[in-house]
Structures are given as structure tokens and as C-alpha cells.
């Protein structure tokens, strides 16, 4: 009723499918309140193009949307996995001056450099100095924390310029602490929370118009009858995997 879909008090609303309601990978699903939570894929959008619209791409779109990115900004994205790259692609829609993406995994940084040469890449151990050298305002104007580690949470506020926006979309295994005495003079704005599905129709429109393309993230494809091998590959991050698409079972 108020647009805060994630905080819906109805037991069948909000975080329902795959969360409170089991069966996120079932053959058939019944979608409660489908007029709000279900979006038709346009005819000109393939299944592979639409695959991430309801999850990691929606997260990236939401992160960029609430981060108040302006032309001329330097945007730092912490995490070069699928969600980080989706955040990067959606940040590009706002035409910032520069995007920097940070990750400890050389393979993921190489993935970004090979496909998005205008994006700067750096590892966490050199991030703070690198961001300052490549930001006209002495730090990132916007930081999107997507990695979810203790180090990335600390880097988020350390690499931000005074009065920057720090958007936290990551999930953490442990509680994080804001060292307010160390941050006192930076006057940072923190935004955080879980993404909803309210922008899915707009995301699909952008895909249909060629403004968003996440198909490069699909590095591996498995039939449904080999899904256990797909899970093993993804969990162990072998063979440069980013995302795995599952197709109908092969006979």
C-alpha cells in the first residue's frame, strides 16, 4: 500500500517465494499477489536476457537507483561478482564520470577488464590510494558495497569522500561496526536494505531496448538433469564461473 514491498506484513507478501514459501525451484509455483509481484517478459526479450531481472540485476538496479549517482561522479563498487557487475551496469545508466570496481579475485577483475575496458579495476590492498588518485574529489562520490566481507565494509567508508553516499546491499556473516569516532568528520550518508521487485518492468524495458545486457555473466549452461554438477561448479567457483543457466532436462 505504501510501496515498502519488502516490509509487507501479510504472510503471503514481501519476501515470499523461496523464503517464507518453499519451492523457489519447483516445476510449478503459485504467486500470491501476482498483480504486484509478477512481470510479463516482453516478446523481444529472450529467457537468457531476462534471467537475472528478478534477482541480481534487480539488486544492482536498486543499488544504483538509491545511490543518487550524478554525472561527474566517481562510483566505487566493492565486489566484482555477478551482483557487483550488475550494479556496475546499472550505474552506467546514470552516466558517472568514472566507475572503479574492487575485488581480491584476479580472474573476476580480468573478466571486467576484458568486457568493460572503460571501468577501472583494483584489488582491496591498494584500493584507498587508487580511489583517491582517480577521484577528482579526493574519494568516491558514491560507494556501493556488494562484497559482504569485513574488509569491504571498512573500505566502503574509508574510500568515500566527505559527504558521499555509501550504499550497502551486501549480506554479512557477522555484525559490522561503524567506528563513528574515526568517521566523524566525513558526514557520510548510509543507505542499506533488501531489494524489492518493483522495478522489474523497467529493467525488462531497458533490456528490450538494448540498454542492459547481462548475458555475458552466463558463463556455463547445464541441463536440469545435471544440476548437481552445476551447483558443485558454482559453489567451488571453478573454471571462471560467474553464473550458471539451467535448461530443460536432456533425454
Q: Where are the predicted features?
A:
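Glycine-rich phosphate/adenylate-binding loop and adjacent beta-alpha elements
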Residues: 1-38
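A general structural signal for well-ordered alpha-helical segments in protein cores
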Residues: 5, 26, 38, 57-60, ...
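Short, well-ordered beta-strand micro-motif
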Residues: 30, 40, 245-247
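Mid-domain Rossmann-like dinucleotide-binding core that forms the NAD(H)/NADP(H) cofactor-binding site
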Residues: 40-125
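Glycine-rich cofactor phosphate-binding loops and adjacent beta1-alpha1 units
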Residues: 67-68, 92, 97-100, 109-189, ...
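Conserved acidic E/D residue at the C-terminus of a beta-strand in Rossmann-like folds
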Residues: 103, 170, 194
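C-terminal hydrophobic helical "lid"/dimerization subdomain
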Residues: 154-158, 197-251
Amino acid at each position: 500500500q505504501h510501496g515498502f514491498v519488502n516490509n509487507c506484513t501479510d504472510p503471503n507478501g514481501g519476501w515470499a517465494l523461496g523464503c517464507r514459501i518453499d519451492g523457489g525451484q519447483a516445476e510449478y509455483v503459485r504467486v500470491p499477489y501476482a498483480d504486484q509481484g509478477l512481470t510479463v517478459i516482453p516478446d523481444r526479450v529472450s529467457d537468457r536476457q531476462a534471467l537475472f531481472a528478478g534477482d541480481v540485476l534487480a539488486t544492482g538496479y536498486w543499488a544504483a537507483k538509491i545511490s543518487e549517482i550524478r554525472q561527474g561522479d566517481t562510483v566505487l563498487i566493492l565486489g566484482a561478482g555477478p551482483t557487483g557487475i550488475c550494479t556496475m551496469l546499472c550505474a552506467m545508466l546514470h552516466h558517472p564520470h568514472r566507475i572503479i570496481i574492487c575485488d581480491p579475485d584476479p580472474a573476476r577483475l580480468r573478466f571486467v577488464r576484458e568486457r568493460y575496458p572503460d571501468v577501472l579495476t583494483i584489488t582491496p590492498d591498494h584500493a584507498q590510494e587508487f580511489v583517491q588518485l582517480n577521484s577528482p574529489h579526493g574519494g568516491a562520490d558514491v560507494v556501493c558495497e556488494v562484497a559482504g566481507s569485513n574488509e569491504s565494509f571498512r573500505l566502503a567508508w574509508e574510500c568515500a569522500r566527505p559527504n558521499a553516499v555509501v550504499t550497502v546491499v551486501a549480506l554479512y556473516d557477522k555484525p559490522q561496526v561503524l567506528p563513528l569516532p574515526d568517521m566523524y568528520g566525513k558526514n557520510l550518508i548510509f543507505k542499506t536494505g533488501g531489494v524489492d521487485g518493483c522495478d522489474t518492468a523497467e529493467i525488462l524495458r531497458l533490456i528490450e531496448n538494448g540498454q542492459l545486457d547481462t548475458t555475458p555473466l552466463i558463463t556455463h549452461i547445464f541441463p536440469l538433469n545435471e544440476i548437481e554438477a552445476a551447483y558443485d561448479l558454482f559453489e567451488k567457483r571453478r573454471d571462471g564461473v560467474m553464473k550458471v543457466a539451467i535448461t530443460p532436462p536432456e533425454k
